[in-house]
Amino acid sequence: MASISDSETTNHGSIWDLDQNLDQPMDEEASRLKNMYTEKKFSSILLLRLAFQSLGVVFGDLGTSPLYVFYNIFPHGVDDDEDVIGALSLIIYTLTLIPLMKYVFVVLRANDNGQGGTFALYSLLCRHAKVSTIPNQHKTDEELTTYSRQTYEENSLAAKIKRWLEGHVYKKNCLLILVLIGTCTAIGDGILTPAISVLSASGGIRVQNQKMSTDVVVVVAVIILIGLFSMQHYGTDKVGWLFAPIVLLWFILIGTIGALNIHKYNSSVLKAYNPVYIYRYFRRGKSESWTSLGGIMLSITGTEALYADLCHFPVLAIQIAFTLVVFPCLLLAYTGQAAYIISNKDHVVDAFYRSIPDTIYWPVFIIATLAAIVASQATISATYSIIKQALALGCFPRVSVVHTSKKFLGQIYIPDINWVLMILCIAVTAGFKNQSQIGNAYGTAVVIVMLVTTFLMVPIMLLVWKSHWILVVIFIVLSLMVELPYFTACINKVDQGGWVPLVVATTCFIIMYVWHFCTVKRYEFEMHSKVSMAWILGLGPSLGLVRVPGIGFVYTELASGVPHIFSHFITNLPAIHSVVVFVCVKYLPVYTVPTEERFIVKRIGPKNFHMFRCVARYGYKDIHKRDDDFEKMLLDRLLLFVRLESMMDDYSDSEDFTMMEEKTQGSSNALLLTGKAGSNTMCSTGDLSYSSQDSIVPAKSPIRGNSLTRYSSQTFGDELEFLNLEFLNRCKDAGVVHILGNTVVHARPDSGIIKKVAVNYVFAFLRKICRENSVIFNVPHESLLNVGQIYYI
């Protein structure tokens, strides 16, 4: 392997000017009307149907909380009825302020084209302000139909906030760290939710048989968890239709049982709806009441998952489901349990199961277990989605992402993460064996994610919504007034199980931040080390090499410039393919890039060099699937570009053109071709409309993007065009080779000890255990050529 140092970086003077003239980044495309995402209008019947379906996806975790809340509030039993009333009052108003007021009616509106979660908020901010730490975006990316953002007046508060965020690198890093903290803690939820939900549901088998050992309950829970994680690779496509009926039946059951218990045991518990009992609760219990907030916090677990699992359900459907079904049923369930506990103070440990009438006990137990499985499945799926988003934004090591459904884009499975989650989940379940300590861990994880969301909502409200600063202050003050006391109570229980999410989150944070840091530094190094076009031109059309038949795809992270891997390759192996295509696969801060807008193709240098660049753009929900035939799509776009470029020769003297596919009115497969122009003359030829100042837009493309065909000179009437296309087809028939860089990254000798450990050991270890680029890009092994290099960052 060759070694590269930082001294080989920039070019200056005439060479730099020549390089800029011959190898500009993608030109800005002509402005056009974009199909911006807007909330779709649904009929009333369809809206109710979607609200019903959202129950099984969004609310499972929140709905299973009554299984374990009161036990975690009063782990040592209840002495006074007033304590139960005060705790119930806190539950009622916590449910009202956080899930209902904050999330359902405010935070859900901050979705990224139907996608929720911490990274969705970060993507919104990256589009509205230049806060991304990987500088691989270009203004052409802003022309995507899914790339929506606001414009600001120069002296507006939003413009000042935008400039402040963009002002210094450390502010961008602080924002990224905040996002990673929320993401890492949310991953911890993926471990704790299945553990506490399944363990609590399984505990019902012991209520009817008090002689049964606790170990039996743990074994049953572990068996269920193993089965749950082992079935993940099948996806939920075939059984997903059962989730909504199960969860709806669960909510109806707990609501009905709660109402019966209120009537049967103690209807005076309804006075808990008077918030004065919250004050009395704290005045009487003082430090013990404050400590119990960690248990009360569990009543809103699943609220953050409610936002992360948005899954393209319209916000209105989720609002309907929560306000009409979830919220009232939860209030009845908690109120009924409180009424039962007041009359049976010794049964607080198993209050939920003991309050069930004997005639329906086992059916309710079965539904409870199924509801716990559904809640766990939703959280596991949300964890996959979070990791996929982090992977797309360069914040997670490369892992294999598998589609489990041909119908639904969002249903994915990550094998490596699945088994790690299963092992950790079983370890937590078997290690703690009781709901109390797992509950302490769970509460800590949930409140941290909520605080991160609160802080991220501030720039969202200012930049995206352009809200008045007074409304922003009201939102953050009310949110922190509720969340900070819960946070302090949960942190106080670190030694009682609360350390688990902190350890998990810290480990994930180190992995994600080190990976992102080294990814950014490697990208910056490649930018500084790219080869000048003057050097390429000096080699001549043959590049000073033997041009062998075939097409070489050179993969690079650079969207402009010739990567150093190319010069390293031809220096050590003086032969290159007849056609060279530099392929840049990059992810943008959008949820998806439409297939017809995915590729940008450009020629590099004179035509007789036969060098091209292709940028393939993806959103954080898009996936490289094996059946996509990425290689074939690249070749199709390359042939189409050459044909359209030939058509432009009659109208422009320039040899530098850019082709970008886009949606246009009346044709979903229209293609946009832009180039340098010398006049403002309007011309037309056949189906082509051309303005030399703007663009060429074929309304109906004569070439289909999904087929490679032979072209005759009679078809195009242009011999040069025919020869170019025949040349490309012959090269394609000769074979395609994928050239990937296999770089080893080391810290520079003068680096500090922390950086050396992070780069030379942590990052190196992650590179060894993660998937290779060839696997991620689905490159055939027989067509793969790795080029080794060493980077010092």
Curated annotation (Swiss-Prot):
Q: Which UniProt keywords apply?
A: Glycoprotein, Ion transport, Membrane, Potassium, Potassium transport, Transmembrane, Transmembrane helix, Transport
Q: Identify the GO cellular component terms for this protein.
A: membrane
What's an example GO BP annotation here?
potassium ion transport
Pfam families per the record?
A: K_trans (PF02705), K_trans_C (PF22776)
- Which parts of the chain span the membrane according to its record? 55-75, 88-108, 176-196, 216-236, 239-259, 290-310, 316-338, 360-380, 412-432, 445-465, 469-489, 497-517
Q: Which residues lie on this side of the membrane: Extracellular?
A: 76-87, 197-215, 260-289, 339-359, 433-444, 490-496
User: Which family is this sequence assigned to?
Assistant: Belongs to the HAK/KUP transporter (TC 2.A.72.3) family.
Q: Give the protein name, as stated in the record.
A: Putative potassium transporter 12
Which gene is annotated as encoding this protein in its UniProt record? Answer: HAK12
